[in-house]
């Protein structure tokens, strides 16, 4: 058995596209609902409808659950950043031209 050598006539395209997500995707839209019964109601939409033209999740939350939901989005953003670094580390560690001799 030898090493696998692909045919010289068949070269499937291998896209080198970094795994990135638009940071605006993790923003959200909060609107205070003017309800007489409970003035602490908020409508939160993730991602914002004016940025993302697709599926938008909106829910009505009170103030305590609103902070929990925003904290959940913050943790989700950290997880996606770590996943991006694991899948495509060169996107985060490449040297920018002109900064080769720069040190802290």
UniProtKB/Swiss-Prot annotation:
It is found in: Membrane. Disruption phenotype: Displays increased levels of spontaneous RAD52 foci in proliferating diploid cells. The keyword Transmembrane applies. It is a single-pass membrane protein. GO terms for cellular component: membrane. The chain crosses the membrane at residues 63-83. Coiled coil: none annotated. The keyword Ribosomal protein does not apply. Keywords: Membrane, Transmembrane, Transmembrane helix. May be involved in a pathway contributing to genomic integrity. This is Increased recombination centers protein 13. The gene is IRC13.
């Amino acid at each position: 058995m030898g090493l696998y050598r692909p045919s010289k006539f068949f070269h499937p395209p291998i896209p080198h596209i970094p795994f990135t997500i638009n940071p605006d995707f993790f923003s959200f839209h909060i609107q205070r609902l003017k309800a007489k019964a409970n003035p602490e109601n908020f409508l939160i939409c993730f991602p914002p409808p004016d940025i993302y033209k697709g599926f938008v999740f909106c829910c009505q939350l009170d103030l305590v659950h609103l902070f929990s939901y925003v904290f959940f989005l913050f943790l989700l953003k950290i997880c996606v950043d770590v996943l991006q670094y694991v899948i495509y580390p060169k996107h985060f560690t490449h040297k920018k031209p002109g900064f080769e001799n720069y040190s802290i």
